[in-house]
């Protein structure tokens, strides 16, 4: 069996779970990959760079892209739009790369529905709700109201952890990174069901 198709690795988790830190920790160690940069209407934060962390656009621009079917998936989170562009993802998959998504539970459900055969999903969580609150407050980037909304969203997201292939509890960055590297390697060799079925059909051929 000669498996050359690219693969998808979805990473989800509450804001404050440490997804960005975890990705930064492993990105140079998991081989040839493409990190999908989401488009968003939320305000740019201090230290972020347009086109590196996100593609920042206005709400009217985002809605126009929806009409033009520009997105593989999109969702509204905390009153802001987030979406994943189709073209660069298709190009990366065609070249055999591991495509990494940092998306929410809604986005994961859409990706699984459309590309589940080549998708491995990981939910990243802080060890406790109190630890999540501590991390959000330490960032000093959100108001008290925004933090409360993020916490309520996190509670809802935690109810959908069972939809994922793996759960990483990010209470130790190095240990969490070690686990994610192993999962990324496994994602690369996941075989689509159509290829498995072809192999089974041809297995007895002489």
Curated annotation (Swiss-Prot):
CDD domains per record: GMPK (cd00071)
E.C. designation(s): 2.7.4.8
Transmembrane segments: none
Primary site of residence: cytoplasm
GO CC annotations, alphabetized: cytosol
Binding residues for ATP: 13-20
Keyword Cytoplasm: yes
Reaction equations catalysed: GMP + ATP = GDP + ADP
Start and end residues of each Guanylate kinase-like domain: 6-185
Molecular functions per Gene Ontology: ATP binding; guanylate kinase activity
Keyword Cytoplasm attached: yes
Alphabetical keyword list: ATP-binding, Cytoplasm, Kinase, Nucleotide-binding, Transferase
Function: Essential for recycling GMP and indirectly, cGMP.
Family: Belongs to the guanylate kinase family.
Protein name, entry field: Guanylate kinase
């Amino acid at each position: 069996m000669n498996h050359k198709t690219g693969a998808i690795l979805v990473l989800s988790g509450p804001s404050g779970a440490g997804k960005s830190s975890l990705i930064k920790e492993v990105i140079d160690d998991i081989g040839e990959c493409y990190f999908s940069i989401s488009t968003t209407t939320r305000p740019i934060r201090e230290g972020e760079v347009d086109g590196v962390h996100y593609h920042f656009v206005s709400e009217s621009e985002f809605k126009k892209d929806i009409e033009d079917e520009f997105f593989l998936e999109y969702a509204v989170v905390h009153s802001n739009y987030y979406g994943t562009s189709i073209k660069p993802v298709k190009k990366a998959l065609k070249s055999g790369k591991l495509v990494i998504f940092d998306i929410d539970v809604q986005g994961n459900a859409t990706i699984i529905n459309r590309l589940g055969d080549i998708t491995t999903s990981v939910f990243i969580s802080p060890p406790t709700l109190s630890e999540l609150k501590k991390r959000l407050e330490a960032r000093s980037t959100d108001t008290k109201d925004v933090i409360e909304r993020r916490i309520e969203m996190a509670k809802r997201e935690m109810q959908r952890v069972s939809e994922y292939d793996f759960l990483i509890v990010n209470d130790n960055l190095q240990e969490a990174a070690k686990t994610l590297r192993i999962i990324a390697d496994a994602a690369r060799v996941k075989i689509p069901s159509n290829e498995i079925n072809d192999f089974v059909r041809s297995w007895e051929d002489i």
